[in-house]
Structures are given as C-alpha cells and as structure tokens.
Amino acid sequence: MSTVNELVNLVDETYDISQIEKEIGLDNIALSDLELLATGGYSPLTGFLGKKDYDSVVETLRLANGSVWSIPITLPVTEEVAETLKVGEEVKLVNGGNVYGVIQIEDIFVPDKEKEALLVYKTTDEAHPGVKKLYERPNVYVGGAIVLTKRFENNPFPSYHLDPIETREEFKKRGWKTVVGFQTRNPVHRAHEYIQKSALEIVDGLFLNPLVGETKSDDIPADVRMESYEVLLQNYYPKNRVFLSVFPAAMRYAGPREAIFHALVRKNFGCTHFIVGRDHAGVGDYYGTYEAQEIFANFTVEELGITPLFFEHSFYCTKCEAMASTKTCPHGKEDHVILSGTKVRELLRNGEVPPSTFSRKEVVEVLIKGLKKEVVTE
C-alpha cells in the first residue's frame, strides 16, 4: 500500500519579519510542534489548530474535513497576551530570544480543558503527566497557519535529526519499498528487539525513531538512550536493514490516541507499517493493555495511509529458551522473565545488572554509565 501523501513544507528562512511587531512566546512543546508542522511531520496540518478543527479532533479524532488526526496541536497563550492579539494579524513566534517563525492568526479561543483532558487523555487526574502539562500551559489557544523562519541550531543529535523529506530519501536510496516504524522513549531491551526483528522479517527496513522531545522526569535521558541504540544496532542488527533518526516531539502520554498520532507521523516520515505494542504511549494504569491497538479498529488502513502491526507482550521463556510472546509460547508466567522499564531503571540505579535474557550487555553498560553520570550531576 502506498504512503505517498503530500508533505507540507512551511520552512522559509528568507521570510521578511522586519515589519512584524507582536510576538508570542513558545514553550518547548510548542517549539517542537512548530518545527514538525513546518517540516511536514504533522502533514496535513499547516498550522496550530483553530477552534473548528480543535473541537473536531477532541471529539471525533478527525479534522473538520474528515481526515484522521487524533492529538490537538495547539498554541496556548495567556489571557494578557490574547488581549493584545487580533484575528488576521501576523505575529512572531519566539523562544529564548530567537524568532523561529510566524503565525497568521485565524482564531483565538478559550478551550474547555477539562473536556480536552477527559477525551484526549481519558482522565482529569493531574497526576497524569499529559494532563498536568495541559493544565500548566496557558488558557487561551491561538490558531493559524505558520511559517518556520529559522531552523534550530542546537539540536542535541544533529546527525540523527532528519526531516520527513530526508528520511523518505534515505529509504528510497536503500531501495526499501516497505518500512516499519518503531516509536520508543525507552532503551531497547530484548523484548523490543524481538518485536522489531519479527516485524523486520516481513518488510524491507526498520525505522527506529526514538522520541527526544520533552518526556517525564524519570524517563532515561535522551543522550543515554541514543548511545544505547547505537551500541545495539552496531552489534545486533544488520546495518543495511535499519535506519536510526530522532523524533523531536514532546511525549503526550495519551495512550491510544497517541498511538494513532505516532502512526500518522511515521507515515509522513516514509513508513508503510507501524509497530503498536502493549500499552503504547501509556503511563501508569490509565489505559488498558491493548487499548492502543483496539483504537485502530475505528479507522480503515486507507484512511490512515499506514498499516499498523500489533504485537503481544513479549518476554524470555526459560522453558522455550527463547524470546516469545503469549501467541507463541504455551508456558506459564512462572517460566517468563518479564521486567518492566521501571524495574530496570530501579536495578540500574542500584548498580545491579539485569539478566542477559532481558537486556544486551552492551546496552546495560551504557545505561549504568549514563545513570552514574546522572547521579554525579544531580
């Protein structure tokens, strides 16, 4: 199935901003959203959502024109700033003293944040990191088309920071007709490796696309994770079958809705397939184990433009003496080595080494070294 959808390109570094006086300050989430809007990562979006599209996305997981889109991409401003703005104006988008873009204001509105929390995150509990962030951000949304007038200079992983047009080119260069995307915000342990390689058996290439935008404080730092991906790919994956590049978005922790969002974005990066595992983009116990897979039943593959691949929870089985899942292994829980990401972080922080059935030794070494460094700097 083809994924040739038109990529939005709203990057124009020659755009004249000299006559624009007003400005809106962007937080880190809005800044990463601005870049992904401009480079086509969020195609078909061409800007921050206006009220009509926002309401439609929150209520129906579709834009007002019917296209599937599951996460509201919004630009929040304070009441004070909103009072100075008018529909029809061009306003500069600023972060850390730099102008990164311009928005043509089409809409200024006050969202019902409780409704957004309930429908997007399925909870209004402020202990949920996505809801907490939603409530912390300002209370008025500004919608409108954007232009990115300045590229970010201090990307932490410049050699892995590729726009959708570039990843598509890379896949083409490698002759990959089918590419499976894998989203992660964690180090890749044996369970993920098993799933990725199972998927790789049926496609030409694997696109490992770790998220390096804002995550919650107890997630393993991005630089440590990147090093762990490098050693894993170097030692255990065929180099001509895998491509590593970062996804600079913030983590929303919106579970099922974010699974759809992650699939749509990977389609833009050039993937034909997308891996959805257990509790994709989940946090705590807010979502059912396979809810992020079940939500895909609401959409056709044609509408999505990408084929989801669903995987059960995998583990090492001491009886099978292999990685397996409940689909392939008949043995009981007592034979399964299952460690959660949280459990692994705990072991590593205590300097304990997870078993080789759980994680590759090279990955463990990188993580222990990284976490020691973290302790020293805290």
UniProtKB/Swiss-Prot annotation:
Enzyme Commission no = 2.7.7.4
Query: Which Gene3D superfamilies does the record match to this protein?
Result: HUPs (3.40.50.620), Sulfate adenylyltransferase (3.10.400.10)
GO MF terms here are: ATP binding; sulfate adenylyltransferase (ATP) activity
Q: Which GO terms describe its biological process?
A: hydrogen sulfide biosynthetic process; sulfate assimilation
Kindly state which keywords UniProt assigns to this record, in alphabetical order: ATP-binding, Nucleotide-binding, Nucleotidyltransferase, Transferase
Pfam families linked to this entry: ATP-sulfurylase, PUA_2
Classification via SUPFAM superfamilies: Nucleotidylyl transferase, PUA domain-like
The pathway entry for this protein reads as: Sulfur metabolism; hydrogen sulfide biosynthesis; sulfite from sulfate: step 1/3
Please tell me whether the keyword Cell division is annotated for this protein: no
User: Which catalytic reaction applies to this protein?
Assistant: sulfate + ATP + H(+) = adenosine 5'-phosphosulfate + diphosphate
UniProt keyword Transcription present: no
Q: Which HAMAP family match?
A: Sulf_adenylyltr (MF_00066)
Q: Which NCBIfam families match?
A: PRK04149.1, sopT
Can you say what this protein is called? Sulfate adenylyltransferase
Q: Which organism does this record belong to?
A: Bacillus cereus (strain ZK / E33L)
Q: Which gene encodes it?
A: sat
